[in-house]
């Protein structure tokens, strides 16, 4: 199965108060050109679709255009939220999008079920794990103490019923233990880093 993986689009980003939207439109066009050339079975967008939890209208329009173009190309699309994304913003019309094979996992809301695609070699299970934070998952794991992002991710992954005999892809936007955050991560993230 041919996959195209992208992440950290940060649509709507401003650099030194200058909008990068025109540059981002160019990048979206390049992504679409790659899709036209490579014809992937699925496009995986692994978080930080937007640069801010409350994106401006122009950023939302660019994502809308990208989704329309992806739907026209008939590839399956799987999107998860990242720490910069608002789950509420990404979840808008997600059930409607599924009719166009666009699957969006904006927030952890209980055990994750896979999305299964098939190719000439059989089925592939895709597990869409949105960005998880202790505050967003703690209520689902009352018997566990979840103190940090790593424990949140471990709890969520521990609930997945992954069949290791099957081809499996887990799409995530994790917080990496031991990593460092730059100023823009701390300032623009929906959750503190």
Q: What function would you assign to each model-found segment?
A:
Residues 1-68, 72:
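N-terminal active-site segment of His-dependent metallophosphoesterases
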Residues 2, 41, 76, 123-125, ...:
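Residues at the starts of beta-strands that form the adenosine-phosphate
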Residues 14-16, 47-66, 81-101, 106, ...:
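Metal-dependent catalytic neighborhoods of phosphoester/phosphodiester hydrolases
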Residues 85-193:
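His/Asp/Glu-rich metal-coordinating catalytic cores
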Residues 8, 12, 40-58, 74-88, ...:
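Active-site neighborhood of divalent metal-dependent phosphoester/pyrophosphate hydrolases
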Residues 2, 13, 25, 74, ...:
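Context-gated lysine
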């Amino acid at each position: 199965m041919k996959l195209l993986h992208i992440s950290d689009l940060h649509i709507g980003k401003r650099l030194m108060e200058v909008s990068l939207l025109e540059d981002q439109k160019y990048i979206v066009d390049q992504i679409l050109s790659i899709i036209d050339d490579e014809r992937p079975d699925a496009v995986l967008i692994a978080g930080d679709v937007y640069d801010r939890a409350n994106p401006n209208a122009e950023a939302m329009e660019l994502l809308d255009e990208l989704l329309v173009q992806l739907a026209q190309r008939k590839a399956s699309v799987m999107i998860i939220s990242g720490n910069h994304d608002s789950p509420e913003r990404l979840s808008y019309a997600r059930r409607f999008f599924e009719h166009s094979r666009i699957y969006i996992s904006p927030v952890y809301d209980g055990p994750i079920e896979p999305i299964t695609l098939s190719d000439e070699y059989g089925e592939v299970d895709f597990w869409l794990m949105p960005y998880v934070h202790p505050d967003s998952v703690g209520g689902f794991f009352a018997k566990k103490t979840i103190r940090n992002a790593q424990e949140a991710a471990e709890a969520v992954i521990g609930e997945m019923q992954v069949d290791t005999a099957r081809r499996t892809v887990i799409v995530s936007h994790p917080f990496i233990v031991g990593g460092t955050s730059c100023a823009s991560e701390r300032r623009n993230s929906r959750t503190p880093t």
